[in-house]
């Protein structure tokens, strides 16, 4: 690096012009100079040099020790002629100067060449930047950072806000799962009874599509363990041991229609704590308070109201995850349309996507109780209040609204793709007709002329 700077300095036009009066040009490595220091020539010329305007600071590791060059001009005898002992460096090659004799010695007034100085500063800066970027800091291929995965539901499970059960021994747990699209309650009831569970048959007749089972040993004393199994494919466990829950889930696998993924089932669940207290049953700050003075049948009905809302929540969570997965599958279509690229989807695939959307929309809006209150609560105001409060806490209405908006957007996108494919098909048919007409005209012309 210092040798290149010296050769660059030697090639300057101003130094070459001033060197015609010198006998030799010596380059020495001396101690670092101060910011402003003067060098005196033997011919009486004093040049004030501002070092940091000509030599920018170099921060490379290989240039830790600054090397300052000092130019000593010694005036030669006017009667003797000497060639210029300097080497010019141009385009990376050495160029020796021509042997032209010097003229007679004349006193000259030296003026700083500002244009050459500016060029020298630019050259040094350009050379310094090239060294620091290429030689000292080699380029490295940085790995691409992947985006974090998006959350798969509109509302996170309520279990994240639950207090620890060990703090209050009276707290019991209610857990809801959605494992399939539908259960076969008849065969399921028979197998559970054969396994030692007790079926509760005291529910009203209008409480259809529900199977209530009692367990012998509950997780905590004070409330009997109860299991609510809905035909829609959801199970709600009240004060049931974890070992018992796993056994029931294994039994459910043999009576399911279109089961869901196990990981999705265990993630998209709902957990609420409940406690037996005096007074009216209610949902207060995410905690269910059951009236301890009620008899077993009334307590089962109140648990059914809470379980019904939890069943809707976990089913909606599964459908939210399904919709998010569908959105990820068509996420590349808007980007491809924006970039002007060709969308690689056939007409059959587009119609299949539309069928998935219509099926999901039908489940949410037509075959479930998300939009209206079930008929079971019309003449049971106290149970309807518990059901509505739980749905409000679980944000059922808002989540359904968000899902319908997403479905509408996906429907518009699939309609756009279907229209685009129809236009392409129509254009292809038009071109086929044009080609056929052209062939027919050519045959007619051949018949006429030949």
Curated annotation (Swiss-Prot):
Keywords: Mitochondrion, Protein biosynthesis, Transit peptide. It comes from the Eukaryota. Homooligomer. Required for mitochondrial translation, possibly by coordinating the assembly or maintenance of the mitochondrial ribosome. It comes from Mus musculus. GO terms for biological process: positive regulation of mitochondrial translation; translation. InterPro entries: DUF155, RMD1/Sad1-interacting. Belongs to the RMD1/sif2 family. Residues 1-5 form a transit peptide. One of its GO terms (cellular component) is mitochondrion. The gene is Rmnd1. It is found in: Mitochondrion. This is Required for meiotic nuclear division protein 1 homolog.
């Amino acid at each position: 690096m210092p040798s290149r700077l010296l050769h660059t300095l030697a090639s300057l036009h101003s130094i070459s012009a001033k060197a015609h009066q010198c006998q030799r040009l010596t380059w020495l490595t001396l101690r670092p100079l101060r910011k402003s220091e003067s060098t005196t020539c033997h011919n009486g010329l004093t040049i004030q040099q501002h070092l940091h305007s000509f030599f920018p600071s170099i921060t490379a590791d290989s240039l830790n020790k600054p090397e300052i060059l000092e130019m000593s001009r010694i005036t030669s005898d006017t009667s003797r002629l000497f060639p210029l002992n300097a080497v010019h460096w141009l385009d990376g090659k050495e160029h020796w100067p021509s042997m032209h004799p010097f003229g007679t010695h004349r006193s000259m007034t030296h003026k700083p060449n500002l244009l050459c100085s500016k060029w020298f500063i630019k050259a040094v800066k350009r050379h310094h930047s090239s060294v620091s970027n290429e030689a000292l800091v080699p380029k490295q291929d940085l790995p691409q950072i992947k985006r974090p995965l998006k959350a798969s539901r509109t509302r996170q499970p309520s279990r994240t806000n639950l207090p620890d059960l060990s703090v209050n021994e009276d707290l019991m747990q209610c857990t809801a799962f959605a494992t399939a699209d539908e259960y076969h309650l008849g065969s399921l009831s028979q197998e559970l009874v054969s396994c030692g569970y007790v079926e509760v048959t005291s529910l009203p007749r209008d409480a259809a599509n529900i199977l209530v089972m009692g367990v012998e040993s509950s997780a905590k004393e004070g409330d009997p363990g109860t299991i609510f199994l809905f035909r829609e494919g959801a199970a709600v466990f009240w004060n049931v041991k974890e070992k018992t829950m796993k056994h029931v889930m294994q039994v459910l696998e043999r009576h399911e229609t279109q089961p869901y993924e196990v990981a999705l089932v265990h993630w998209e669940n709902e957990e609420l704590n409940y406690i037996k207290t005096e007074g009216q049953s209610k949902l207060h700050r995410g905690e269910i308070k059951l009236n301890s003075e009620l008899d077993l049948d009334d307590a089962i009905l109140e648990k059914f109201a809470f379980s019904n809302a939890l069943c809707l929540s976990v089913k909606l969570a599964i459908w939210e995850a399904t919709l998010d997965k569908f959105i990820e599958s068509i996420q590349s279509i808007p980007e491809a349309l924006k970039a002007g690229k060709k969308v690689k989807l056939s007409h059959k695939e587009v119609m299949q996507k539309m069928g998935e959307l219509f099926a999901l929309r039908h489940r949410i809006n037509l075959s479930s109780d998300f939009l209206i209150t079930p008929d079971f609560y019309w003449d049971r105001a106290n149970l309807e209040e518990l059901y509505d409060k739980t749905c409000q806490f679980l944000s059922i209405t808002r989540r359904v609204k968000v899902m319908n908006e997403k479905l509408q957007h996906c429907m518009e996108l699939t309609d756009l793709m279907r229209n685009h494919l129809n236009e392409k098909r129509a254009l292809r048919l038009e071109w086929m007709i044009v080609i056929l007409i052209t062939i027919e005209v050519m045959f007619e012309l051949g018949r006429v002329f030949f």
